[in-house]
């Protein structure tokens, strides 16, 4: 297998359980106890999925232990029996608190804030049974409480189970297939724009029935869903639909702690002495001289989404496989270390600057709250925080990669605290912070999407899913870069404001990013053996230069 050492079979019960779970999550046939989770293609989101499955067997694992001990033989001693009471399995009802990212959403006061969704269009060549589909969505809305939320005057409210039914809008597509696309797009746009935050439902579903199979649109307001949530929902949709079709009473894994409980615990955590130590890191970041503005081709006061255009590139399956596996052996890196180095090199080439600010987005489900398990919880947990890409060593790729890796490791709790400080912590605890750093560019690596191909029930439809975001809502950033892996290929998309950038400008930047990424892949594959950095040794005070001198002496 890619990234494997010589195969060493699991021996104990726990080693076998971990090996089975890794095989399921990573889609591999054989995993030994000395194989590295990350060089097998794992990432932090795969780590969450692994922890979720482990939890279903009555065990827990903290993500930091997976990152520090990424082989089964090392990790096995860090797996613990789940203690304390299981999450409440009853329905969540009544008022709740906003999470930091939800507070960001309402602070921005977007136009058409009701039309700010995430969506997916599924295709089943054998069709979806409308009655089973509607029942499946009902089961999901009962189980995943966030899907029953509404927002009145920016206050979250969970409705009861009597409001868990979801209406499935069914459209019969007659006539030639080439005419279907326009109708699907028209009806999908209508469904996407019909969500009401005040009255709900925040989930809309449309079933388009055609001779070549059915297309199912699921649109959910972003306030209650994120990338990890979609993985959970698609997995559960497949499971419940299949059980109902077989005539079984549908069963799902136990609920993990609720989105409401997460928001409540964050409120308490935000003013604790242990957490407030993070403020020093963000204050130092704010004090640095940094380039946050991209060189625009022209200026525009019109920031509406309708002016967004996109360019993208994809790597070959072979390049993607290397990027997911062997590349990380050279410097013990993770995906973001590589992608952000390529981004920084391309930005330096474009702006001529050495120190460049970007907004980073992460899944936000970090292990910061003791005893809280949110591995199978649906909600909007995303973290959003500024990072400074230091590109002074761009001419020395080895040093630059190691520097980027160390800079990322120094971000406390993967940046989740920035939003907590900004939106939840009491004013007297953050007087030295301005929260004014506002880069033009945002970056988000979403991980791997295998739920479509693994399902057996559906694939991603090629039909239009309508506009997830209102064309009249404001674009938060001038340039949004999103990366993901689907069907074995890495794709990077560049969504830009067309009144500020020419297409050729962004195409040139995309080409530069891809070129640097391929150079990094080649560089890492050409290294003789792994090279350690201070974070590998667990030493926060040791610098790269000091470690290099030590290694020379040794």
Task: Give the residues covered by each predicted segment.
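Regions immediately C-terminal to embedded phosphopantetheine-bearing carrier domains
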Residues: 1-114, 131, 135, 181-182, ...
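Hydrophobic (often cysteine-bearing) scaffold residues that line and stabilize catalytic clefts
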Residues: 10-18, 129-130, 180, 184, ...
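A short N-terminal helical cap/helix-turn-helix that marks the beginning
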Residues: 26, 65-70, 79-85, 147-151, ...
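Gly/Ser/Thr-rich phosphate-binding loops and adjoining beta-strand/alpha-helix segments
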Residues: 30-35, 48, 52, 93-96, ...
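Acyl-group handoff/entry surfaces in thioester-processing enzymes
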Residues: 53-55, 90-162, 167, 177-269, ...
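His-Asp-centered acyl/peptidyl-transfer active-site segments
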Residues: 91-92, 110-117, 145-146, 188, ...
């Amino acid at each position: 297998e890619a990234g494997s050492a010589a195969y060493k079979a699991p021996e104990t019960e726990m080693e076998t359980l971990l090996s089975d779970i890794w095989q399921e999550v990573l889609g591999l046939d054989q995993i030994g106890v000395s194989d590295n989770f990350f060089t097998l293609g794992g990432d932090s989101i795969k780590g969450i999925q692994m922890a979720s499955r482990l939890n279903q067997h009555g065990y827990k694992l903290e993500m930091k232990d997976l990152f520090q001990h990424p082989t089964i033989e090392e990790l096995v001693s860090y797996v613990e029996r789940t203690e304390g009471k299981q999450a409440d399995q009853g329905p969540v009802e009544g008022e709740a608190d906003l999470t930091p990212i939800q507070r960001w959403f309402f602070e921005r006061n977007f136009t058409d804030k009701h039309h700010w969704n995430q969506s997916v269009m599924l295709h089943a060549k054998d069709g979806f049974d409308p009655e089973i589909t509607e029942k499946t969505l009902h089961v999901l809305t009962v189980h995943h409480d966030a899907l029953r939320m509404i927002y009145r005057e920016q206050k979250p409210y969970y409705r009861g189970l009597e409001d868990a039914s979801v209406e499935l809008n069914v459209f019969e597509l007659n006539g030639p297939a080439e005419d279907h696309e326009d109708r699907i797009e028209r009806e999908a746009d209508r469904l996407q724009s019909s969500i009401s935050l005040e009255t709900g439902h925040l989930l809309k579903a449309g079933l388009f029935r055609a001779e070549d199979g059915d297309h199912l649109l699921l649109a959910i307001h972003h306030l209650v869903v994120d990338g990890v949530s979609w993985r959970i929902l698609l997995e559960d949709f497949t499971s419940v639909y299949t059980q109902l079709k077989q005539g079984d009473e549908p069963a799902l894994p136990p609920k993990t702690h609720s989105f409401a409980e997460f928001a409540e615990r964050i409120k308490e955590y935000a003013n604790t002495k242990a957490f407030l130590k993070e403020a020093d890191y963000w204050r130092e970041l704010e004090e640095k001289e940094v380039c946050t503005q991209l060189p625009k081709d022209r200026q525009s006061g019109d920031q509406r989404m309708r002016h967004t255009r996109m360019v993208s590139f994809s790597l070959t399956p072979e390049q993607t496989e290397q990027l997911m596996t062997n590349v990380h052996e050279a410097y013990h890196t993770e995906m973001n270390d590589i992608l952000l180095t390529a981004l920084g090199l391309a930005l330096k080439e474009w702006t001529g600057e050495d120190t460049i600010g970007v907004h980073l987005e992460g899944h936000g489900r970090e292990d910061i709250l003791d005893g809280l398990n949110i591995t199978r919880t649906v909600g909007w947990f995303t973290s959003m925080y500024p990072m400074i890409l230091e590109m002074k060593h761009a001419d020395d790729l080895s040093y630059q990669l190691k520097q980027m890796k160390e800079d990322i490791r120094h971000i406390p709790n993967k940046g989740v605290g920035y939003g907590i400080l900004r939106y939840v912590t009491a004013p007297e605890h953050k007087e030295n912070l301005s929260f004014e750093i506002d880069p033009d560019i945002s970056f988000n690596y979403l991980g791997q999407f295998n739920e479509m191909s693994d399902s057996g029930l559906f694939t991603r439809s090629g039909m239009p899913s309508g506009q997830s975001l209102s064309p009249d809502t404001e674009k938060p950033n001038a340039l949004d870069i999103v990366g993901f892996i689907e069907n074995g290929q890495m794709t990077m998309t560049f969504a830009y404001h067309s009144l500020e950038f020419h297409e050729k400008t962004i195409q040139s930047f995309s080409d530069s990013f891809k070129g640097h990424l391929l150079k990094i892949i080649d560089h890492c594959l050409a290294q003789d053996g792994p090279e350690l950095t201070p974070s590998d040794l667990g030493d926060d005070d040791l610098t790269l230069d000091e470690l290099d001198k030590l290694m020379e002496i040794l």
